[in-house]
Amino acid sequence: MKFLALFFLALVGVAFAYDGGMDGMDMIKSYSILGAMIGLGIAAFGGAIGMGNAAAATITGTARNPGVGGKLLTTMFVAMAMIEAQVIYTLVFAIIAIYSNPFLS
């Protein structure tokens, strides 16, 4: 947790370190890209943790009762697809925020 706090604190300096030649539209583009990448990173990190937990629970359940391994595997694949869908939704939102930002028109 301390590492993340230090990382984001260091990132603030990069976000505000701009040359005086930038106008407001460039700042909006910069913040859009920064927000999209941070959001996508958080979504991918959370999705990876969720997928790892789902796989671990499936392996544990199959080890305890091998007879239901097929049903657990099917349920795990459905859960993984739903977890991955959330990351893809975040990717779509990030692409929209970068390329068709309503604040830039």
Swiss-Prot record:
Primary localization class, coarse: membrane
- Site annotation (Reversibly protonated during proton transport) points to 84
Gene Ontology terms, cellular component aspect?
plasma membrane; proton-transporting ATP synthase complex; proton-transporting two-sector ATPase complex, proton-transporting domain
Print the keywords alphabetically.
ATP synthesis, Cell inner membrane, Cell membrane, CF(0), Hydrogen ion transport, Ion transport, Lipid-binding, Membrane, Transmembrane, Transmembrane helix, Transport
Record's subcellular location: Cell inner membrane
The record's function comment reads:
F(1)F(0) ATP synthase produces ATP from ADP in the presence of a proton or sodium gradient. F-type ATPases consist of two structural domains, F(1) containing the extramembraneous catalytic core and F(0) containing the membrane proton channel, linked together by a central stalk and a peripheral stalk. During catalysis, ATP synthesis in the catalytic domain of F(1) is coupled via a rotary mechanism of the central stalk subunits to proton translocation. Key component of the F(0) channel; it plays a direct role in translocation across the membrane. A homomeric c-ring of between 10-14 subunits forms the central stalk rotor element with the F(1) delta and epsilon subunits.
Q: State whether it acts alone or in a complex, and with which partners, per the record.
A: F-type ATPases have 2 components, F(1) - the catalytic core - and F(0) - the membrane proton channel. F(1) has five subunits: alpha(3), beta(3), gamma(1), delta(1), epsilon(1). F(0) has three main subunits: a(1), b(2) and c(10-14). The alpha and beta chains form an alternating ring which encloses part of the gamma chain. F(1) is attached to F(0) by a central stalk formed by the gamma and epsilon chains, while a peripheral stalk is formed by the delta and b chains.
Q: What is this protein called?
A: ATP synthase subunit c
> What species does this protein belong to?
Helicobacter acinonychis (strain Sheeba)
Gene for this chain: atpE
